[in-house]
């Protein structure tokens, strides 16, 4: 386990409380990307899955959300248990071999 993974694993439990997200800004940014329906989206550094609730209204075919920190992924999975469109994976973005995405969000 590297230092980055360790840091984010220790922050996972309180991440949503300490990391401020502006819903208006998130929606504006996503609207400007012209996300289309039925897209395959890769969310790199997904953390606790905050963006997924903003991505789902665009009716994607699939969202693959990756993060290096296993505890972040566990928190995200708890938010979307067994969601048919979202797959949360503990992966390093530099070694992830997924292919064929219409959009990649960093």
Question: Regions from the language model: what does each represent?
Answer:
Residues 1-36, 38-45, 50:
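Conserved class I S-adenosyl-L-methionine
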Residues 16, 43, 67, 92, ...:
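Acidic active-site catalytic centers that drive phospho-/nucleotidyl reactions
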Residues 36-38, 60:
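A general structural motif
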Residues 105:
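A conserved beta-strand element that flanks and buttresses the S-adenosyl-L-methionine
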